């Protein structure tokens, strides 16, 4: 099964009334171990490097976000400043000049969406939430 259509849907869900998308890169990883579910070849793929996926998964699996609080959230080799976590399911982070990142867990996956600098992270949050909630509704 290809999960890449979920990335297209996530980008579409982030569009505002004018049709501007507020997600430029995204991916889905497994909650157990952080392995990529989506392919790096997708036009909007967020490409996690090295231990970034496993480290993100470890924090969400344990619901201990101390590593994010002290060392930031790392994605694509960039360090994003941790802003907050909500209900042990959602993490928001930002890097000046590079945009923001929203991460939300379902039962078995973590959905990540990147908002470009100048974009509306609120739209990114909504789009990531739609996909994560859909996966959750499927028991995933």
From Swiss-Prot:
SUPFAM superfamilies from the UniProt entry: Profilin (actin-binding protein)
GO cellular component, one term: cell cortex
GO biological process terms on file: regulation of cellular component organization
One Gene Ontology MF term: actin monomer binding
Domain of life, source organism: Eukaryota
UniProt signal peptide: none
CDD domains to which the protein is assigned, alphabetical: PROF
Family from the record: Belongs to the profilin family.
Complexes and interactors: Occurs in many kinds of cells as a complex with monomeric actin in a 1:1 ratio.
Function: Binds to actin and affects the structure of the cytoskeleton. At high concentrations, profilin prevents the polymerization of actin, whereas it enhances it at low concentrations. By binding to PIP2, it inhibits the formation of IP3 and DG.
Protein name, per record: Profilin
Organism: Suberites domuncula
